[in-house]
Amino acid sequence: MNRLVIVDCEAPYGCASPATGDMTEFGAVHYETRASFHGKDCSRETMQFFDAWVRSVTPGRAIFVSDNNGYDWQWINFYFDKYGISNPFGHSSRRIGDFYAGLKSHFFDQSSWKQMRVTKHDHNPVNDAMGNAEALHKIFARKNVK
């Protein structure tokens, strides 16, 4: 589990993708240590620091985990690509809700896991990523996931 990094991205309301605007900030939490990273913008320097941070907290290729990976991963991948930085997550990601639905054998139960968050979901991306990491810890413990 030491390769898991939980990520949350924020963008202005109505901004659905990098084609229509810019990410305003993002947060990441290392699953095992709960070390965090706060990207306060989407500049080249921030993405370089994020790349270095991810590589420092994970052995081998990091695994991108998110509440909504279709949304969050597109932003992170876009800015890594924009600045010519190799994405430390590669071209894949994992969604907590889909994993949880599979564990419960209930295809449509993709959000009840959110009740397991401890840190309040307040759209501060570090807090949101931390809450998701906390919930994932509980899911793994309850289901004896290795």
Stretches with model-predicted labels:
Residues 40-47:
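A conditional alpha-helix N-cap/helix-loop micro-motif detector
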Residues 2-4, 21-24, 30-38, 51-146:
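Metal-dependent phosphoesterase core characteristic of DEDDh/y 3'-5' exonuclease domains
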Residues 9-18:
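Short acidic, Gly/Ser-rich segments with clustered Asp/Glu that frequently serve as metal-coordination loops
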